[in-house]
Curated annotation (Swiss-Prot):
Gene encoding the protein: qcrB
The protein's Enzyme Commission number: 7.1.1.8
Protein known as: Cytochrome bc1 complex cytochrome b subunit
Topology class, membrane: Multi-pass membrane protein
SUPFAM superfamilies for the chain: Transmembrane di-heme cytochromes (SSF81342)
Stated family: Belongs to the cytochrome b family.
Binding-site list for heme 2: H132, H234
Organism expressing this protein natively: Streptomyces lividans
One example GO MF annotation: ubiquinol-cytochrome-c reductase activity
Superkingdom per UniProt: Bacteria
Cell membrane is among the record's keywords: yes
Keyword Membrane: yes
Subunit and interaction comment: The cytochrome bc1 complex is composed of a cytochrome b (QcrB), the Rieske iron-sulfur protein (QcrA) and a diheme cytochrome c (QcrC) subunit.
PROSITE patterns named in the record: CYTB_NTER
Keywords per UniProt: Cell membrane, Electron transport, Heme, Iron, Membrane, Metal-binding, Respiratory chain, Translocase, Transmembrane, Transmembrane helix, Transport
């Protein structure tokens, strides 16, 4: 028996080295069972899902280039005399951090290219996360059970902002010094504890002698470590919850239609990584970003025209357009012109973080009837109120971004900086309201157009003249795929307060919270917030040849 059992293994010969290594690992880690459960994981195919991949690959590029830069950067504020290759600054006294950054740019082989790849990848990472979160927001991909993953993504965006700021501050050039001074002023505006926080951060009076080394530790160890953990958790939850998908034939709330992880998706993802790396490298090779040599080292008597940063620019815009109000009481000054924007900044971020929970409470989506493990994504037009809120927020963001760069707008377009400031102040309050109303009306108009397309077909551009002289355009029925896309979305009813009296005829107490929830729910799912989908009877009428041309 033993001889017969051993015959197949003898005829097969010695297993390949890779298989032997895999067998060794499986015997200790059980990788075969893990691979069996995940290698055939299905991923939907849609261009918007690539936004998350851009963020992931940019983060990997940031880590790779950052490791290279740490080999040559000296995080010290000790003053040295510069004797490097950049002639205009030779002989000048500067911090060792600034001198080492100049050496990376001009003396280290490939150093300038790596610096620029690192910087461009950071910007693309932040911009990619911003756009990715907007995609998740507008399509409703944050709904139960994915609220935790929304929080992970939100924390990645916030930590990415602060990681970018600390990295931007490390070279100790004039631009980074201006940003540090801006941050220090914001910290000092905090009543009671602002001074203590500033002394703790800078190790004494600004600028101190330790902030570069402290920011360096935060930039390369603390924040990236937390972000890496959040990123891993984010990906694990994507696998656990399965991927969301847009409506289409064969797609329901109980399945995922797409490509398997191996070999199709992995091959595409690998190619896309090198494509992202290549594009960033080409951009870095031909487009200079953050040149530190023209402005020189930081100094207390110089202030450059600093452009507003991509994500933190809106916080800078808040401070620039806020009136310089102050309150003097009991020998202390409360600088409202800085402190109020400093309060608004975290409040806006907190509102973004908790929005999924607010919507689930308002709309009742968390009720058992609406719990879906793998919900189909919304088309933004089918969620007019949410889409209007998103566009209103984007309006605020871009208005404040203009405020953050008001000096550059004024100099480049020959405008009055006071006029720009007043425009931003007014648009901050008026713009979101106008954007909300306009967006909601546009969404409802698109819903009406979709309903008309389902009932009457699409326009064919064929004009016919009837016997009595009337001209009409012939409409053709839409495809089954289009029909499914236009009618697959669910339409919910707004939450109701219920009867005003109980079963005994006694008036039931209704709390103010219940009334508020019902009113807000009406704004999401009421008659004025969604156009009813065509009924089966209406569709049968069109398919039977009646009611359309």
């Amino acid at each position: 028996m033993s001889t017969a059992a051993n015959e197949p293994s003898r005829s097969r010969g010695k297993a390949p080295a890779g298989e032997r290594v895999a067998d060794w690992a499986d015997g200790r880690l059980g990788i075969y069972s893990l691979a069996k459960a995940n290698m055939r994981k299905i991923f939907p195919d849609h261009w918007s899902f690539m936004l998350g991949e851009v963020c992931l690959y940019s983060f990997i590029i940031i880590i790779l280039t950052g490791v290279y830069l740490t080999l040559f950067f000296h995080p010290s504020m000790a003053e040295v005399e510069y004797h490097g290759s950049y002639v205009p600054l030779q002989g000048q006294m500067m911090s060792e951090a600034y001198a080492s950054t100049l050496d990376i740019s001009f003396d280290v082989r490939g150093g300038l290219l790596i610096r620029q790849i690192h910087h461009w990848a950071a910007l693309i990472f932040l911009a990619g996360m911003f756009v990715h979160m907007m995609r998740v927001f507008f399509t409703g991909a944050f709904r139960k059970p994915r609220e935790v993953n929304w929080l992970f993504g939100f924390l990645l965006l916030v930590l990415g902002m602060f990681t970018g700021f600390t990295g931007y501050s490390l070279p100790d050039d004039l631009l980074s010094g201006t940003g540090i001074r801006f941050m220090e002023g914001a910290i000092l505006s905090v009543p009671i504890v602002g001074t203590y926080i500033s002394f703790f951060l800078f190790g004494g009076e600004f600028p101190g002698h330790d902030f570069v080394s402290r920011f360096y530790s935060i930039h390369i160890l603390l924040l990236p470590g937390i972000m890496l953990g959040l990123l891993v958790g984010h990906l694990i939850l994507v696998f656990y919850h399965k991927h969301t998908q847009f409506a289409g034939p064969g797609k329901t709330n109980k399945n995922v239609v797409g490509m398997p992880l191996l070999p199709v998706y992995t091959a595409k993802a690998g190619g896309f990584f090198f494509l992202v790396f290549g594009v960033i490298s080409v951009v870095s090779a031909i487009a200079t970003i953050n040149p530190i040599w023209p402005s020189g080292p930081t100094g207390p008597t110089r202030s450059p025209p600093a452009p507003s940063r991509l994500v933190l620019g809106f916080s800078e815009g808040l401070i620039r357009v806020m009136p310089g109000w102050e309150i003097n009481a009991w020998g202390h000054t409360l600088v409202l012109g800085v402190f109020v924007p400093l309060l608004i900044f975290p409040l806006v971020l907190a509102a973004i973080a908790v929005y999924p929970f607010i919507e689930s409470w308002v709309t009742g989506y968390k009720r058992e009837h609406y719990i879906l493990d793998r919900p189909l994504l919304d088309r933004p037009r089918n969620a007019p109120t949410r889409t209007a809120f998103g566009v209103a927020w984007l309006t605020v963001y871009f208005v404040l971004l203009i405020g953050g760069g008001n000096d550059l707008w004024a100099t480049h377009f020959h405008l009055s900086i006071n006029a720009i400031t007043w425009f931003v102040r007014i648009a901050f309050f008026v713009g979101p309201v106008v954007a909300f109303i306009a967006t909601k009306r546009i969404c409802l108009g698109l819903q009406r157009r979709d309903k008309d397309k389902v009932l009457h077909g699409r326009e064919s551009a064929i004009i016919k003249r009837l016997p009595h002289g009337e001209f009409i355009e012939v409409h053709e029925p839409i495809s089954q795929e289009q029909l499914h896309t236009l009618t697959a979305h669910e339409q919910y009813k707004p939450a109701e307060i219920g009867p005003t009296v109980d079963e005994n005829g006694v008036e039931r107490k209704v709390s103010g919270t219940q009334k508020l929830r019902a009113k807000l729910s009406e704004s999401y799912y009421g008659e004025e917030s969604q156009i009813p989908k065509p009924t089966v009877e209406e569709y049968k009428e069109i398919t039977s040849g009646h009611g359309h041309h």
